[in-house]
Amino acid sequence: VDRRSAILPPGAPEDVERISPVEASWRYLEHLIEAWDHVVAKGDPELALTKQSVVLTVPASFDASARELTTEAAYAAGLEDLTLLEEPQAAFYAWLAAKGDAWRKEVTAGDVVLVVDVGGGTSDFSVIAAVDKGGELVLERVAVGDHILLGGDNMDMLLAHIVEQKMIAEAEEAGRTLELDRWQRISLQHAARGAKEKLLGDGKAKSAQIAIAGKGSKLVGGTLRTEVTREEVQQAIVDGFFPVVDSAARPATRARAALTQLGLPYAQDPAVTKHLAALLARHADALPAQGKKSPKLLRPTRILFNGGVMKSPLLRDRVASCIDGWLAEEGVEGARVLEGADLDLAVARGAAAYGLARRGRGIRIRGGTARAYYVGIEGAVPAVPGMEPPITALCVAPFGMEEGTSADVAGGELGVVVGEPVHFRFFGSSVRRKDPVGAAIERWKKDEIEELAPIEVDLPAEGRTKGDVVPVTLRSSVTEVGTLLLEAVPLQPKKKDERWKVELSVRGHD
C-alpha cells in the first residue's frame, strides 16, 4: 500500500473524496492546532501550539517508515518542536504520574510490566522491566508486539453482523423480507458499539435495545428494532476475541487468495490472547534467565491495561486469568494488575508526563529502537535461470539504539547510482537483540527477520554523470524526535561534509 496515495476512506463510494493516510494525519493535527489556538492561545502568538514542545504518540509497533510518515504529517501541520512516544509507554508514564513516589512500592526491581493496549483499531503490547543497576531502579522497554490491526472496531462489526441476522430472522417470521443497505449497516455498527459497552461494562444490564432507521418514509414506524443479550455479547466478544488458550497457542494464518483487494493488513486471527501468547514466547529471552532452565515465555509480574476496549472488567479479568494460566504452566506466581489507570486519557496524560521527564522532572523509560534494522545487499553472482541472487542483511541500526546516538555502518563499500531513483531492500527484527552495527546476516530463521518497506534513494549527481555508481558508506542515527535516519556518505565527496539522506519508502509489501 502506498501511504501517500488517496486510499481513505476504504470502500467509499466514487463520489466521496479520498485522501492519503499522510494527509489524513496532518488534517487531524491541523484541526487540533486550530482548536488549541482558539481555546488556549486565544490569539496570543507565543501560546500557539506550533510554538510549543509537542509529544505525539504512536503505536509501539510502528516501524521506522511509519514513524517517518507521522513526523512528516506533523511538520506539514506546522509542528516543528516534536517528539514521538510509543502509546503503551505513554500509558505507563500516566500510571507513574498518577501514583507519584508511591509507584516504587508497586513496581520494584525484578518486576516485568506487560502493557496491554487494545483500542478501537489496534492491539498494541509492550513489556517494561524494572532493573536494578548499581543500586538505581531503571525502567527499560524490553519487548514490543507486532502491528496488529485488531480492536474494538472488529468487535463492533461482529456484533453488528449477529444483530443483522437476528433482524432478518425476525422479519422472516413476520412474513417480511429484510435487506440492509450500506448506511443502515454503518448505523447498526454504531448501535452495536453502544450495546457492547453497556453489556460488558460495570453495570448489571442483561440486555440492550438496538434500533436503526428503516428505509421507509415513516420516521418512527420505519424503525428497525431488536434486542441483544449479555450472554450473546459475552459469547461473541469475550470468547471470540479473548478465548482461553494455552501458552503454546499462536495466531492462525491462512493462505491468501491470488487476487486480494488492496487495503490495510488486518490481522487474520481475531484472538487477542493468541497474539499475546506469541509476543511473550517470541521474547522469552528478553531478560536474563533466572535459574538453569530457560523460560518458554517472557514472564510478566504486573499487567497494565489501556485502551477503550479494556474498560470492560470482563475483558480485563479474562486477559489476566489467561496470563496467570500461562505463568502457572511455568510454575511461577500470577501477575498483579496495576490499578488506578484512566483508560480514556492515559495516553494523553502520559505524553505530558513524558515531556516533563525529558526535562528532568520524572523517571524516564529506556528502550531505544524496538527493532534492529537491516539493508539487503544483493550478492554479485552470475545470472542463473530460476535462481535469485543471495541476499545478505546488513545491520544498520541495532536493537535498542538510543535517541541522539549514531553509528557508522562498516559493511564494505556500497555502490549507489546517482541522478536517478534507486532502492535498497529494508528489513527489521524484534528478536535479534545482539546484532551489532555492520553485522552481515546471510541466513536467518523464518519470522526472525521480516522484510519491511524498501529504502528509496534519489541522490543528486552533484557534478557527476547521471547513472554513475558512487561508492558510499552508510551512517545511521536515531533522531531526538524518535525516527531512524540513514545517510549515504560518498567515499570521494565532491564537497565538504557531502552526504545524502536515505528516505524510508512508504510503499509496503502486501
Q: Where are the predicted features?
A:
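Acidic low-complexity intrinsically disordered segments
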Residues: E80, G201, I212-A286, G362-D510
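Conserved phosphate-binding/catalytic loops in two-lobed NTP-binding clefts
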Residues: A77-A90, P265, V319-G350
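Gly/Thr-rich phosphate-binding beta-strand-loop-beta motif of the actin/hexokinase/Hsp70
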Residues: V1-D2, G100-R141, D468-L491
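Short beta-alpha connecting loops at secondary-structure transitions
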Residues: L139-L150, E172-L180, T260, E329-E339
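Conserved phosphate-binding catalytic cores of ATP/NTP-utilizing and phosphoryl-transfer enzymes
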Residues: L84-V116, A281-A284, Q290-S294, L345-R364
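Hydrophobic, small-residue-rich alpha-helical packing segments that form membrane-like cores
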Residues: D37-D44, S53, A60-F62, T70-T122, ...
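Gly/charged contiguous loops adjacent to phosphate- or pyrophosphate-bearing nucleotide/cofactor binding elements
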Residues: D2-E23, E46, L150, N154-I323, ...
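Short glycine-rich, Thr/Ser-proximal phosphate-binding strand/loop in the N-terminal lobe
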Residues: K133-H161, K496-D510
